[in-house]
Amino acid sequence: MTECFLSDQEIRKLNRDLRILIAANGTLTRVLNIVADDEVIVQIVKQRIHDVSPKLSEFEQLGQVGVGRVLQRYIILKGRNSEHLFVAAESLIAIDRLPAAIITRLTQTNDPLGEVMAASHIETFKEEAKVWVGDLPGWLALHGYQNSRKRAVARRYRVISGGQPIMVVTEHFLRSVFRDAPHEEPDRWQFSNAITLAR
């Protein structure tokens, strides 16, 4: 999958609701509840614990030194009443770097990752997200989810705790929900790590 990061100028052209969601640095489901005017629920599509982190670029972002086991979690955020699919997300979580209570809650409930982390009171730092327009993740179609568009705005960020990366989260904002997104011309996107939305 090729990722062409969006410049600040391209991000400012996105629909207001989508800009709010991209800029959200807290619990995405809380913001999405307001933007979508619906109770947002988590549907776990698939999750798996890897005893050793696979050789994938996303796993490498967790760091190779003593990463231990990794929980790979695919989820959909959707409206309870509308049943609209809002976000498709993948999380890679270094579970040996977190308390067992967090892992138990993640693997035995449908609670949103952000809510689980907020309730744990663990001090974390969310790195600045990289934003791009790209293909929807392949796992979405493999599990029977269809979307009228094949591309979406996405963001990826790492969460750090105790000086170590504990998770990498990739979120795809499903374009059929956000109506006035930019034209899909991937060759126009400029590379940028800066997402300065508040000016």
Swiss-Prot record:
Its EC number is 4.1.3.40. Inhibited by 4-hydroxybenzoate, but not by pyruvate. Optimum pH is 7.5. Active from pH 6.8 to 10. Pfam families: Rv2949c-like. GO terms for molecular function: chorismate lyase activity. GO terms for biological process: chorismate metabolic process; DIM/DIP cell wall layer assembly; monocarboxylic acid biosynthetic process. It catalyses: chorismate = 4-hydroxybenzoate + pyruvate. Keywords: Lyase. Was identified as a high-confidence drug target. Belongs to the chorismate pyruvate-lyase type 2 family. This is Chorismate pyruvate-lyase. It comes from Mycobacterium tuberculosis (strain ATCC 25618 / H37Rv).
